[in-house]
């Protein structure tokens, strides 16, 4: 079955916005891909991958981690006005959509949603690199302006992977 954005005319604007957001995540995604190539850690993963000591994530099937630090809780129910989200224990979580409101992990919260929502929560201690300039393709465009989102937790380090996009000169 072919599923292209233009096949869903009523949702085309929402799909476009999601695609543009995905391109803004290119620096974060590229760094996660580099990490995956070195460690074998999946880029998109079940919560249990990182939170094995939290039994509440064992049965969670709709929330997932994007990279190590972004919890995504897609809106999957048509017409939903709220979404319950379990935030894994052991750290704090910052709500991407609510001015980085901080929540303690180990609890289920209920947040307002619309079809335009992509509920995302940033793990404390994360540094998320995003493109500030609008990218339209992964091949032809390059990040020229970088925006860092920091979810506080004392002193933290992160790795931002970048290369020329063409050669293996980085080795």
Language-model segments: which ranges?
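Catalytic core of carbohydrate-active enzymes
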Residues: 1-171
